[in-house]
Amino acid sequence: MIACRDVSFSYPASGPVDGECLTEGALKHITCTIEDGSFVLLCGASGCGKTTLTRLLNGLIPHYHEGTFTGSVYLGGKDTRDLSLFEISQMVGSVFQNPRSQFFNVDTTSELAFGPENHGLPEKAVRERVRLVAEQLRLESLLDRSIFSLSGGEKQKIACGSAAAIDPDIYVLDEPSSNLDAYAIADFRKLLMRLKAQGKTIVISEHRLYYLRDLADRVLYMKDGEIRGDYTAAEFQSLPAERREQMGLRPLDLNDLKGIALPHGRTGDSEWKIRQFSFAYKHQPETLHIDEVEFPFCGATAIIGITERENPPCPAACAGWKSGAAALCRNRAGFIPEKSG
């Protein structure tokens, strides 16, 4: 069981820390209990204190991040102040928002094996953990790869696999879907379903809510460093969409998004293309048009084209995993040349 008793925390006033509030305190008088085997969603607008609360639950506060900490956090009845980070890591597996911040190796297989190795598992057991995690998360194609060659989404997948390889009783995840596309999120949801079925305790901080629908048993809504709402899954889902929007939350159902056509079927992660796409603000003529430009990247060929108009603002578009979105940004910044077009 996880228990927070009148917890308040403020970072040193030396600058912003991942958007969390510093001047008035990142957390204020947090009191809550999370039962074993429960699935809890932390939600709220950016800067509300979600990330700071996850750092309290996985021991990074007070053992790594400095600040003013009052109250107590208990894991299995033990105060986190009295536990070392190593002891906490045996109980809690963490996945951070930025996967690069938690890598210890330069290749993917070693990264997956890092946790079990440091917990003293025999070599055979370590290999079996890596095999099992790769199978569950569909990471087989990422094994024996350089960390530096991975896309953002691939790095997050390896980070999730590294946490799962430790096989902890508690999982604390801070926006794990932030670098994943819709298909990868669907795969990740399946992993969460398996962990939930195993009776694991899961605490997940997220802006994307739709993939956690019918998974989370409980929702804690945070604002200004406080827990402003404590809902059962049914209570949260029954809130009117307008109310959730007022709370600064994203839709629970992607079909609620206006003007977006969702893809039907799965034809492969690498088959997304952008063609004949135009963008314009209401007060300006067309500022962006995409036809087709081809350039190689990471051993593959990305086919994306772009034509800029005069005095454009900053339009944006999104596409699927390994669609070439990152390559497009690198191309427009001048880091990689076009192959044609």
Q: Language-model segments: which ranges?
A:
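Conserved ABC ATPase "signature" region
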Residues: 124-142
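ABC ATPase C-loop
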Residues: 163-164
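Helix N-cap at the start of a conserved alpha-helix in ABC-type nucleotide-binding domains
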Residues: 182-184
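Conserved ABC transporter NBD signature motif
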Residues: 66-78, 327-341
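Catalytic Walker B motif of ABC-type/P-loop ATPase nucleotide-binding domains
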Residues: 171-174
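H-loop/switch region of ABC-family ATPase nucleotide-binding domains
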Residues: 206-207
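Conserved ABC ATPase signature
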Residues: 146-150, 154
